[in-house]
């Protein structure tokens, strides 16, 4: 399985794609939220995400962000 490092470049690429594709402003999703989602995806423990404003109050943006992450990361192993 191909491996992909969770780093600032990956996080920024995801945010840029999200903003371009969904015509959202930069406050729609934070770099911190993206990094947290990537870490949870890596570990398989989604508990930390369930308490975020993104998940609780803006579930639509959360789902859209998941689509963008999958389009970039796919099934690659995050390390």
Residue ranges: model-predicted function:
Residues 1-79:
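Function-determining sites in protein domains
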